[in-house]
Curated annotation (Swiss-Prot):
One of its GO terms (cellular component) is mitochondrion. This is Mitochondrial RNA-splicing protein MRS1. InterPro entries: Mrs1/Cce1, RNaseH_sf, Ydc2_cat. The keyword Acyltransferase does not apply. GO terms for biological process: mitochondrial genome maintenance; mRNA processing. It is found in: Mitochondrion. The keyword Cell membrane does not apply. Its main location: mitochondrion. Keywords: Mitochondrion, mRNA processing. It comes from Saccharomyces paradoxus. It comes from the Eukaryota.
Length: 363
């Protein structure tokens, strides 16, 4: 039988259409699936292989969503002295609800033998990892995807970098295969590493900045700033988080991201009640101590929100490639390519909405 006529399961079918797509389409696909890395070569194979490995994780999540009607998504951001996390629930209509959002310091309760801080001894790092998982609020009756990110800074000393690396590896290993209850045959925890470049590309890379920065009174030489500058990306991400919170708080649900806040959150965010538009700071809104805390909370919020949108995009791609049981068809390839281009355009239009707010922020 010709390979063209073979039926395929979902992930091999995704792989097939990625092979048939051109490199430009694969780069767009990487972005809309929040998997865009700064590739240093122009070959399809490494991009495709990485994409397919990411799709394999989302395929498990998609199957659970089909079977159970809801899944939990978590974003975790590890630093040397704390961790931040965000929890959202996605239903089978891809409406997304914010469930929990916290920053928790690594105090003595994360250490063993009455130590005041986490040591690098294996029992301590393992204990801290299990404590983190226990605080996330995973649901034994639902699938839970944990996206893990750690602080990356040249200013961190070696022991702090080592601790973050160890916790990241242990958390990934524990979430990748652990069962929340012994009665379930299938693991209820899934894990994915969330590199900062994924989040930056998904929320920032297509944002037009030049015209807005020229009108920003706090910037004397706007030409000095580029979209890849960390300060610009951090500013854009804060703007995006505020846009999403404001639209959800006002029940003006963004059609692309579909975030919802229940009444409980509206009581927790009094700052949003007393302000209009984006005239508030995340630091004050979330009752945080420092701007660094606000940055960490923004990272986990946007990582979790990106997972929700990625799951919906991936599910739509599955519907396309499985129209003929995974067989190759040139008409389906065109639909695949067109959908990727349209989703990239949708993301570009969403990012463009952040540009206007760059005129008034202090950079």
């Amino acid at each position: 039988m010709s390979p063209k006529n073979l039926t395929r399961s979902v992930v091999p079918a995704i792989d097939l259409y990625c092979r048939k797509a051109n490199f430009k389409t694969l780069k767009f696909l990487s972005m809309i699936l929040c998997s865009k890395k700064e590739w240093y070569d122009n070959t399809k194979a490494p991009v495709r292989n990485f994409l397919v490995s990411r799709c394999a994780v989302f395929e498990q999540l998609r199957n659970r969503l089909v079977d159970e009607g809801k899944v939990n998504l978590f974003g975790v951001f590890l630093t040397n002295d704390s961790f931040s996390f965000c929890k959202m629930t996605v239903d089978d209509k891809f409406d997304t609800s914010l469930v929990d959002w916290q920053k928790i310091p690594f105090d003595y309760s994360f250490a063993t033998e009455r130590r005041q801080h986490i040591s690098l001894l294996p029992p301590d790092t393992l204990f801290a990892t299990e404590k983190i998982i226990s605080l996330l609020g995973v649901s034994p009756n639902m699938a839970n995807l944990v996206s893990i990110e750690r602080q990356r800074s040249d200013l961190m000393d070696f022991s702090c970098k080592l601790q973050s690396n160890i916790l990241e590896h242990l958390l990934y290993a524990k979430c990748q295969g652990v069962q929340v209850t012994s009665t379930n045959e299938e693991a209820r925890l899934l894990a994915a590493i969330c590199n900062p470049e994924f989040i930056d590309a998904f929320w920032c890379e297509l944002t037009p900045i030049r015209a807005s920065l020229k009108e920003n009174p706090s910037i004397s030489v706007p030409q000095e700033y580029q979209i890849y500058d960390p300060v610009i990306r951090a500013t854009i991400k804060e703007v995006v988080a505020k846009r999403l919170l404001r639209s959800a708080f006002d029940n003006d649900i963004d059609p692309l991201m579909r975030l919802r806040l229940d009444k409980g959150w509206k009581f927790k965010f009094p700052t949003l009640s007393s302000t209009t538009d984006l005239d508030f700071s995340l630091k004050d809104c979330l009752s945080l101590d420092t701007r660094r805390d606000a940055y960490d909370m923004t990272e986990v919020f946007l990582a979790t929100m990106a997972s929700s949108k990625t799951l919906r995009t991936y599910s739509n791609l599955v519907d396309i490639v499985m129209k003929d049981n995974g067989r190759f068809d040139s008409g389906i390839l065109k639909q695949f390519n067109d959908y990727v281009k349209q989703e990239k355009l949708n993301l570009q239009n969403f990012q463009a909405g952040s540009s206007e707010f760059l005129k008034g922020v202090k950079i």
